[in-house]
Amino acid sequence: MQTYGKTDVTYAWYAGNSGVTNRSGRFIASHIGHTGLICFGAGANTLFELARYDSALPIGDQGFVVLPHLAGLGIGGIENGVITDSYGMLVVAVFHLIFSAVYAGGAMLHSFRYKEDLGEYPQGSRPNKFDFKWDDPDRLTFILGHHLLFLGLGCVQFVEWAKYHGIYDPAMGVVRKVEYNLDLSMVWNHQIDFLTINSLEDVMGGHAFLAFFLSAGAIWHIFSKPFGEYTEFKGKGLLSAEFVLSTSLAGAAFIAFVAAFWASMNTTIYPTDLYGGPLNIELNFAPYFSDTDPLFGGDLHSARSWLSNFHFYLGFFYLQGHFWHGLRAMGFDFKRVEKLFDQLESNEISLNPAKSTTVPSTSTDSAT
């Protein structure tokens, strides 16, 4: 974290990042703990929505958020937007709750049983490989490679799931197996107009391309090191915990904005049967997405509306966090802004020169 050159900085208990900034073991423990919280939230919300699901109505008319995602993956015997067998969704919910407990145990194990700094393990050991310093580009690129590897494996899993199990096709109203269309010209052309994608084969082709691209990047970053001397142009003096957090928030903001606009307009990935109709973009106190379906209005919103608005504002605040931490990483001290306003308040200026007053200096000068 940015200390502005001070070595004796202390943080309050609620500054959670300070507890893991220079403790790589605790940093991993916090990651595992966060994963457990996400799993628990997913499982609990699935059970919550299942308890309120009305089998006489399509999912898209009930304003659910989690069930449409499971139905889109072909879980639950979905047909024309109606769940025909909810047992699969129940199994998914219970598995998430079980794994949340496993992750919680792993987080506590890494917090209380293992060393809080992985650098204390013997050189060359497996734990020591994942020890890092925020200004060490060699180790950070090694860890980045493993992140890319898991993202690539996630894309592979999604493509294979659609190929052998099937996903929901809104055009046919049933779950069907989808072969990916790995057409590089299609992938290139949909970089900008991805909102208009209307083919599940193209969607799977895009994920197949991402799987290859991410896996190649993972191999590159795991087995390579930055070329040449580590200079200021490559981040020397800037690479820090604040800088990494800033760039991470920028990436999260970008993905959140993409998800918001995609969910609001695309009806192939977000079928009307599952999420409600497309949305309008409106401007009041702030921009927002509004439902066009007459079933929703007032305090009742579609799943599409929830997803789009939540991701839009989440992306907005992520972007502010990116600027905040980015400026701190560059050395800007926000306390200087407070001092500036204090100085402005202490100066009295009159438009009438005869009545202008000067605030006496707080320092005492010796008599001359």
Curated annotation (Swiss-Prot):
InterPro entries associated with the record: PS_antenna-like, PS_II_antenna-like_sf
Membrane-spanning parts: 27-47, 63-83, 89-109, 203-223, 243-263, 307-327
Chief location: membrane
Induction: Transcription decreases upon iron starvation.
GO terms classed as biological process: photosynthetic electron transport chain
Keyword set, alphabetical order: Chlorophyll, Chromophore, Membrane, Photosynthesis, Photosystem II, Thylakoid, Transmembrane, Transmembrane helix
Cell compartment(s), UniProt: Cellular thylakoid membrane
A GO molecular function held by the record: chlorophyll binding
Pfam families, A to Z: PSII (PF00421)
Membrane topology category: Multi-pass membrane protein
SUPFAM superfamilies: Photosystem II antenna protein-like
GO cellular component terms given for this protein: photosystem II; plasma membrane-derived thylakoid membrane
Cofactor(s) for this UniProt protein: divinyl chlorophyll a; divinyl chlorophyll b
Function (record text): The antenna complex functions as a light receptor, it captures and delivers excitation energy to photosystems II. The Prochlorales pcb genes are not related to higher plant LHCs.
Similarity-based family: Belongs to the PsbB/PsbC family. IsiA/Pcb subfamily.
Quaternary context: The antenna complex consists of divinyl chlorophylls (a and b) and divinyl chlorophyll a/b binding proteins. Forms complexes with PSII, consisting of a PSII dimer and 4 or 8 PcbA subunits. These complexes are also found under conditions of iron-starvation.
Protein name (record): Divinyl chlorophyll a/b light-harvesting protein PcbA
Gene name tied to this protein: pcbA
